[in-house]
């Protein structure tokens, strides 16, 4: 066991180790030094403001300072008011002056708030756009080290910190600082000795703050890394949900999630404990200062009375004024410090953003770079290169070759030998480590303007990425960069004061003449839909697109999930060709196409290659696609062998090539080059061997026939190639709308209902609906932590009662100041009491804050885990919905749950504290002076209501945004609100980063996101004004209330109704309560946001999956007894999310046990859907799809009783369902049997454990190679992993890496080539030892040698391990040895059925069979 555990440890880099590795880039001491020595400008967040907004900042600052300066005046007359009330003198003139000051404070605070809200909106927008521009223009090494999920997570986190730290919190700092300084200076002038005595604890508070701040920063930095890791786990799991479900990997993902969250909680709780300790110390030390003040103030009065201080008229009224002044200034400090902490977080976040914004990319943009009249030649000279993430692995060894205009070049070689990296170097995603890339003999690629260079390149990658947009816009994206030039010019003209933006405009404008710029703008204006249609016809997708209900406006879905792989690839080809590039790069451009589509697209590519002004570069494993290239370069990363084997046997050559020649760690080089014919002459050459491995064996009897027959066949093929057979090819019409939904512009029912017309202010002040009872699940979770809740309860009891008791002691102390006989005794007594209160306050506040945060973290972790777990186990139709994209769901899991914690969980404690404080204060106040207490209670309730209305603005803003989502702002073809959401657009851009860079869409997306931000902020001016008015009232309300209280108290005292002493006791208790009420109401906005988040969280949390692997029901399976026979009987199927598209029509066939069954058909004919049904991603049970016959718009309605989907006309959506003639009912029915038992009757987990699937686009996770291979089988040892790696022909490559099986594959496996990813996926599938192996284009990304090895391995596995194999492939060579080949066909678009089935030879013998035509096209 010890050895196995060691092996597992060696091969498994834990989450903690990964994060510690990240932290160790800087030692702990270095981190402390950095925190200490970072010289960050205090006004850094405002650095990006243009001149006009800086004027607003100055106005806001001045008004905030003047507003705070009004408070010292109130304190200065406080003693006079007390004196006049005791003497019965008139105080009305003083009250009127206080009211006047209150009005001034109201106006000043309102102006300050309005200006700051405008500034905050501008800052957040500018920082976001500058961050995005910088990220978009970074180099490939940067993006290797900073995956999109991390960049997006960091951006959200940092902007949230900036948003929290500026705005009203920033002006609060200056307002209250002004009050603090004014009061403190006044107190010093009044009596410096007493003031200094009271404030002697300030240095200690400062030292504690510095020490605590260092500890908090370090722990929060660590916790942020773990939080980023958690987000990466969530996003990858949702992106690869089909892989997770098919391998029953939910528990594996959840375990990694729990581990990451555990470490996050550990470090965040350390930070929270230090913060709680700091808060407790501040509260306790402030009360200690008052104990000193009470004692020393008495000493001064006594000494003054005995003439120890000559000429000192210091008396009790002076002590009261100073104590109150310092008391309020101290309270100002307690408000300032948390806001300063928030602002310091904003400073640090801004600094982190500017580290990215100011980062100079390794591949510079070359503002003044050269532009060339043409591109005639590209030459690699002794190029060496390694990736920054794997510096020990050299990719190339003195690579040299030349590419010339008008020629076509192909690069071939084993997977991982660096073919795709050549393309990345040409695109200048990276620069060579050594050597040069020379253009036109004399221009180094580094000296050429980067944006201009990339504008001349069209790319079709191996794994095409499309945006969640329409087909039309996806094709147009290649020319949208031209639109950016015009949009950016207008933008910069309007923002001429912004240096950063001007610099970027200079980048473009300096690289071309005004005439060129004008021509490009003119060229963009001519991009018409007809151009899109023309290019679609060239790549043969026009018929397919035209058959869709929305045609070119059809949305492709998140990650193009509504398209098959072949459809995505052809749209990607159309996008590249639309650009008419000077350099056309085709990286496995036809790897996902069926033979017929490949032939047609390849013919188009061949036509394009004839362009005399274009360099065409092709990478392909299908060597038939490159035979007409002018030059073929064969790359190898193996050691040269002088002993060539003369044996012509393919297998022997293959074995020699792979086993005798070891991988060369010094990098790849060109081992052969030439035309197809010249390379084929070398019988022992690698290229010749690769060709032989891909040859398709025709029927032996046909091959042995007469030469004339062969010649005729050859002639027929040539005729078809030249066009004589084109009609026949086109007659095989392409019906590929399996995965396309009817994406008509779907409007929500609520958007069509007439909204209640309520005036704005009435809407603000009307009563809210009660919170949903469902919130009890959160409260229940909170109170499940009984020990923590008990500690919080007692700490609230203590802390809630201490302030009113302190207020009572304060009032009694004031009374003793006029009782000179007992003055010394009473002051000593009250000083001791306050010291005891200070100790109790320190303990209670520390415990309350720490356990409040502790429960919050526990609840957040639990809620996040439950939501993530419930989402993971949903059926696939849930993820097919546009509202459930990975980006949206991950936001729900992270942001919404966090808002629930801060807005509900944490605020419960604060609210409970306030209730306790309020109840004690009211009891005391009513006891001493019921009349004053009643009036003040009424006034405070009105004041609190105003606070609540201000807080509701946040919620109303969100509601208004939702109400306005139906208006069209962008050039999208859908009304879906995602396209108007900046977060969604950023998610799109970051996930498709390579495409954004390739097609120069950096500025396009920045402009699009800017419009989305402007739309989001649209119409907020009135709301800002109302918020400013309410803020002004909140700042001046205390002055108005006190003025009224003094007037009312004076009135009652004059009438003899109450005593001055009782009035003071009642008043002081309410002063403390009112100050805490303001703190409570300032958090009200968080509560409203939390309730909004709960409305999103709760439906996802309680949603029951219709196909749940957690269900233990069903027939349990003994794996050893399963034979593996699969029967498909009369299956009719439509996707619930795409009800108008029939997928299958009475589909029936059998996959025999222990045999290999291959499925072939055109792209989009439903081949992959069969595997989805087999894995029970979708069910055929009780699914009814009801369509309205005259449907124009769709609205989904899920009927939970019979699991049916009802789609109705939105405009007629009502309680009446209409007559039966208005609807057409389709049933998903039929059976899929495994060993003669319906698969729905089996236990779902047991069923999926019988299968292993290797998909066309394999999904790997951001883990080590070892962890990825053992995914789905956690009990596997390192030896098991190594064994299957040899089967998958990937072991030699892994062993050549510095970290071997511990090598991390990067986010989504991006650190590996396509072929390497696919071989690891094959190893992962084999490790599960499945009874049924599903191969969906499993070898599409492999080189010929690896493909042959894998095919041989698969045959051996089938023979030795009793496995049923079901394979989908477009390469006929990979399926010709199958026991049965099933041909899918969908000629009338009414659903796919089985056209024919049989062996390869049987199907070839059929006259005019579709399969025979496929074989012909594959030659």
From Swiss-Prot:
For the site Important for mefloquine and halofantrine binding, which positions are given? 331
Q: Which Pfam families match?
A: ABC_membrane, ABC_tran
Gene Ontology CC entries for this record: food vacuole; membrane; vacuolar membrane
Q: Which SUPFAM superfamilies match?
A: ABC transporter transmembrane region, P-loop containing nucleoside triphosphate hydrolases
Q: Where does Mg(2+) 1 bind?
A: 462
Region Disordered: list its residue ranges.
639-665, 697-752
Subcellular locations according to the entry: Vacuole membrane
Record protein name field: Multidrug resistance protein 1
Q: What is the organism of origin for this protein?
A: Plasmodium falciparum (isolate 3D7)
Phylogenetic classification of the source organism? Eukaryota, Sar, Alveolata, Apicomplexa, Aconoidasida
């Amino acid at each position: 066991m010890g050895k196995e555990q060691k092996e597992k440890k060696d091969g498994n880099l834990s989450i903690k180790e990964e994060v510690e590795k990240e932290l160790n880039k800087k030692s702990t001491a270095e981190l402390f030094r950095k925190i200490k020595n970072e010289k960050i400008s205090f006004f850094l967040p405002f650095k990006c403001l243009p001149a006009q907004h800086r004027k607003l900042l100055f106005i806001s600052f001045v008004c905030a300072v003047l507003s705070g300066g009004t408070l010292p005046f109130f304190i200065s007359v406080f003693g006079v008011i007390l004196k006049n009330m005791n003497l019965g003198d008139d105080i009305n003139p003083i009250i009127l002056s206080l009211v006047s000051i209150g009005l001034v404070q109201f106006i000043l605070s309102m102006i300050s708030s309005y200006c700051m809200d405008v500034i905050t909106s501008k800052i957040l927008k500018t920082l976001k756009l500058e961050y995005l521009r910088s990220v978009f223009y970074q180099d490939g090494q940067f993006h290797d080290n900073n995956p999109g999920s991390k960049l997006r997570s960091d951006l959200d986190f940092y902007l949230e910190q900036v948003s929290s730290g500026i705005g009203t919190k920033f002006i609060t700092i200056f307002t209250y600082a002004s009050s603090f300084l004014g009061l403190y200076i006044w107190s010093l002038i009044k009596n410096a000795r007493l003031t200094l005595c009271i404030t002697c604890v300030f240095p200690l508070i400062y030292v504690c703050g510095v020490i605590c701040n260092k500890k908090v920063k370090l722990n929060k930095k660590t916790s942020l890394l773990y939080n980023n890791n958690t987000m990466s786990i969530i996003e990858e799991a949702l992106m690869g949900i089909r892989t997770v479900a098919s391998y029953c990997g939910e528990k594996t993902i959840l375990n990694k999630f729990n581990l990451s969250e555990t470490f996050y909680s550990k470090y965040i709780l350390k930070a929270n404990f230090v913060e709680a300790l700091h808060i407790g110390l501040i509260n306790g030390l402030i009360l200690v200062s008052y104990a000193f003040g009470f004692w020393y103030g008495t000493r001064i009065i006594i000494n003054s009375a005995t003439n120890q201080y000559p000429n000192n008229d210091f008396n009790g009224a002076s002590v009261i004024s100073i104590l109150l002044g310092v008391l309020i200034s101290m309270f100002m400090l307690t408000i300032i410090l948390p806001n300063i902490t928030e602002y310091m977080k904003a400073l640090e976040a801004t600094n982190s953003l500017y580290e990215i914004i100011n980062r100079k990319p390794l591949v510079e943009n070359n503002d003044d770079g050269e532009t060339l009249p043409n591109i005639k030649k590209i030459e690699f000279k002794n190029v060496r290169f390694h990736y920054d993430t794997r510096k020990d692995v050299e990719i190339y060894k003195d690579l040299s070759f030349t590419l010339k205009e008008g020629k076509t070049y192909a690069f071939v070689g084993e997977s991982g030998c660096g073919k795709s990296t050549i393309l990345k170097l040409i695109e200048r995603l990276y620069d060579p480590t050594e050597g040069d890339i020379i253009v036109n003999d004399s221009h180094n690629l580094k000296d050429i303007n980067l944006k201009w260079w990339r504008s001349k390149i069209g790319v079709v990658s191996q794994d095409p990425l499309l945006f969640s947009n329409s087909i039309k816009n996806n094709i147009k994206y290649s020319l949208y960069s031209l639109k950016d030039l015009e949009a950016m010019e207008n933008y910069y003209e309007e923002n001429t004061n912004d240096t950063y933006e001007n610099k970027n405009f200079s980048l473009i404008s300096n690289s071309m003449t005004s005439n060129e710029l004008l021509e490009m703008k003119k060229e963009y204006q001519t991009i018409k839909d007809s151009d899109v249609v023309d290019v679609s016809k060239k790549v043969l997708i026009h018929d397919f697109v035209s058959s869709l209900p929305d045609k070119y406006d059809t949305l492709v879905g998140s990650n193009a999930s509504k398209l098959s792989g072949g459809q995505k690839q052809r749209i990607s080809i159309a996008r590249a060709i639309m650009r008419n590039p000077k350099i056309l790069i085709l990286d496995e451009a036809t790897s996902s196409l069926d033979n017929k589509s490949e032939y047609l697209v390849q013919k188009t590519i061949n036509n394009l290659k004839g362009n005399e002004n274009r360099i065409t570069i092709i990478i392909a494993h299908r060597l038939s696609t490159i035979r007409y290239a002018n030059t073929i370069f064969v790359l190898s990363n193996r050691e040269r062998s002088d002993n060539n084997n003369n044996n012509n046997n393919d297998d022997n050559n293959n074995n020699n090539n792979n086993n005798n020649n070891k991988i060369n760690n010094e990098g790849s080089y060109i081992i052969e080059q030439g035309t197809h014919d010249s390379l084929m002459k070398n019988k022992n050459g690698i290229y010749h061997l690769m060709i032989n491995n891909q040859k398709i064996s025709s029927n032996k009897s046909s091959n042995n026939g007469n030469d004339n027959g062969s010649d005729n066949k050859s002639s027929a093929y040539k005729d078809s190639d030249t066009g004589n057979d084109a009609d026949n090819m086109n007659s095989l019409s392409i019906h590929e709308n399996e995965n396309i939904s009817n994406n008509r512009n779907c409007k929500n029912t609520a958007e069509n209902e007439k909204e209640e017309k309520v005036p704005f202010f009435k809407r603000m002040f009307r009563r809210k609906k009660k919170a949903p009872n469902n919130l009890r699940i959160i409260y229940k979770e909170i109170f499940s932590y009984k020990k923590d809740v008990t500690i919080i309860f007692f700490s609230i009891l203590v802390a809630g009662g201490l302030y009113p008791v302190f207020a009572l002691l304060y009032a009694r102390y004031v009374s003793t100041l006029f009782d000179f006989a007992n003055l010394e005794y009473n002051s000593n007594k009250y000083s001791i009491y306050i010291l005891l209160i200070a100790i109790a306050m320190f303990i209670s506040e520390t415990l309350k804050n720490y356990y409040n945060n502790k429960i919050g973290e526990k609840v957040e972790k639990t809620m996040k885990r439950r939501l993530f777990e419930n989402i993971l186990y949903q059926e696939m139709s849930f993820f097919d919905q546009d509202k459930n994209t990975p980006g949206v769901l991950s936001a729900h899991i992270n942001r919404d749950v966090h808002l629930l914690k801060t807005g509900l969980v944490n605020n419960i404690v604060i609210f409970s504290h306030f209730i306790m404080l309020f109840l004690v204060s009211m009891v005391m106040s009513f006891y001493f002076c019921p009349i004053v207490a009643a009036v003040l209670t009424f006034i405070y309730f009105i004041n609190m209501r105003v606070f609540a209305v201000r807080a509701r603005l946040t919620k109303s803003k969100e509601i208004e945004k939702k109400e306005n989502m139906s208006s069209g702002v962008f050039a999208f073809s859908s009304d879906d609100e995602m396209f108007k959401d900046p977060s969604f657009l950023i998610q799109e851009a970051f996930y498709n980063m390579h495409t954004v860079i390739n097609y120069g869409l950096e500025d396009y997306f920045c402009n699009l996101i800017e419009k989305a931000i402007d739309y989001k902020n649209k119409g907020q001016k009135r709301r800002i004004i109302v918020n400013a008015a309410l803020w002004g009232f909140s700042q001046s309300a205390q002055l108005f209330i006190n003025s009224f209280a003094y007037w009312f108290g004076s009135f009652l005292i004059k009438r003899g109704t109450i005593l001055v002493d009782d009035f003071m006791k009642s008043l002081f208790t309410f002063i403390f309560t009112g100050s805490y009420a303001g703190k409570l109401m300032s958090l009200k906005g968080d509560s409203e946001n939390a309730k909004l988040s709960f409305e999103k969280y709760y439906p996802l949390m309680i949603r029951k999956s219709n196909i749940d692997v957690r269900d233990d029901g069903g027939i349990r399976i003994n794996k050893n007894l399963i034979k593996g026979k699969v029967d498909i009987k009369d299956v009719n199927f439509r996707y619930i999310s795409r009800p108008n598209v029939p997928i299958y029509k009475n589909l029936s066939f059998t996959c025999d046990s222990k045999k290999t069954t291959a499925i072939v058909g055109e792209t989009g004919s439903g081949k992959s859907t069969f595997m989805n049904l087999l894995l029970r991603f979708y069910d055929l049970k009780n699914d009814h799809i009801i369509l309205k016959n005259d449907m124009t718009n769709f609205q989904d309605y899920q009927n939970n009783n019979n699991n049916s989907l009802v789609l109705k006309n939105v405009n007629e959506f009502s309680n009446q369902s209409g007559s039966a003639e208005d609807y057409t009912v389709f049933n998903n029915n039929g059976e899929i049997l495994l060993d003669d038992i319906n698969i729905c009757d089996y236990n779902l987990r047991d069923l999926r454990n019988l299968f292993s699937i290797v998909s066309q686009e394999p999904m790997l996770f951001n883990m080590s190679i070892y962890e990825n291979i053992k995914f789905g089988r956690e009990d596997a040892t390192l030896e098991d992993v190594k064994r299957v790696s040899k089967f998958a022909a990937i072991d030699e490559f892994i062993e050549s890496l510095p970290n071997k099986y511990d090598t991390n594959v990067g986010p989504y496996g991006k650190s590996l080539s396509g072929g390497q990813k696919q071989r690891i996926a094959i190893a992962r599938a084999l490790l599960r030892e499945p009874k049924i192996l599903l191969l969906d284009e499993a070898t599409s990304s492999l080189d010929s040698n690896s493909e042959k090895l894998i095919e041989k391995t698969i045959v051996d596995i089938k023979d030795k391990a009793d496995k049923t194999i079901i394979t989908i492939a477009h390469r006929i060579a990979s399926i010709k040895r199958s026991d049965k080949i099933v041909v899918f066909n969908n000629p009338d678009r009414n659903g796919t059925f089985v056209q024919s089935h049989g062996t390869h030879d049987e199907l070839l013998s059929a006259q005019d069979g579709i399969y025979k035509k496929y074989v012909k096209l594959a030659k």
